[in-house]
Amino acid sequence: MKKCDLDYTQSICDALNTLRQQKPLVVNITNYVVMNNTANALLAIGASPIMAHSQEEMAEMMSFAGSLVINIGTLDSVWIPRMIYAVEQANANNKPVILDPVGCGASALRTNTARQIVALAEQLTIRGNASEIIALAGEQAQSKGVDALDSSDKAIHAAHHLATQNNCSVVISGATDYIVTTTATIALNNGHEMMPYVTGMGCSHTALTGAFAAIGEPTGLAATAVLGIAGEIAARDAAGPGSLQVNLLDTLYHLDEAVLREYIRINLVEEGCH
């Protein structure tokens, strides 16, 4: 492992320790399908989740929360103004915004709403699958509803465009996960092939990204490593997706620095690292 890869590993370990000390509050405007999954993932890693969808309380919430997670999985016309207002309040309070553009490219409503949030958020991290990232950037994507048909490496160019145009970090989920910032592209090769068979796994990834952003790690690197490693370990004793989901929460809860260092497979794809 190169020195710069070791430096990234140390930063991931430090971020996990800090998160558990600070227990940040993460405001989630997320979809009906995954609220329970994402709340449990946040609790297991050491954060404090709240599912707040009311516009009337959002100014108060964002005044003391650590970050805002927006997930457009069950989007409708009622939710959109609430999401926009929440982003405005996050901006007003200098708080990071994490966007999960679920199904971006599958409909004009999803694509336009996601792009509106990207344009508005001042401290932004985007986490999506390859097809969502490609569509969000305005390129031609292949998707089936909310599922990606593009491999994660096919979205790197689109992620670079989004990161550069919006001064943000972009996380591409897939068999290999990529973290794309304005200065580096990092590949992580953890996780397990069973993980896509658990609904809300990507949404949990986004929520964890919000937890780490709340303590000053907005790139998505720590969240991606933590979830990938936890999923890999949880799958060892899982008979199928059902037991994987339960095992994952237990593994997140018990995850520590020694396990992170043992399992992490990280590679700096692009930057001045020799």
Curated annotation (Swiss-Prot):
ATP binds at R127, S173. Substrate binds at M51, G200. GO terms for biological process: thiamine biosynthetic process; thiamine diphosphate biosynthetic process. The keyword Iron does not apply. It is an enzyme of class 2 (transferase). Its cofactor is Mg(2+). It catalyses: 5-(2-hydroxyethyl)-4-methylthiazole + ATP = 4-methyl-5-(2-phosphooxyethyl)-thiazole + ADP + H(+). Pathway: Cofactor biosynthesis; thiamine diphosphate biosynthesis; 4-methyl-5-(2-phosphoethyl)-thiazole from 5-(2-hydroxyethyl)-4-methylthiazole: step 1/1. Keywords: ATP-binding, Kinase, Magnesium, Metal-binding, Nucleotide-binding, Thiamine biosynthesis, Transferase. Pfam families: HK. It comes from the Bacteria. Its EC number is 2.7.1.50. Catalyzes the phosphorylation of the hydroxyl group of 4-methyl-5-beta-hydroxyethylthiazole (THZ). HAMAP family: Thz_kinase. Belongs to the Thz kinase family. This is Hydroxyethylthiazole kinase.
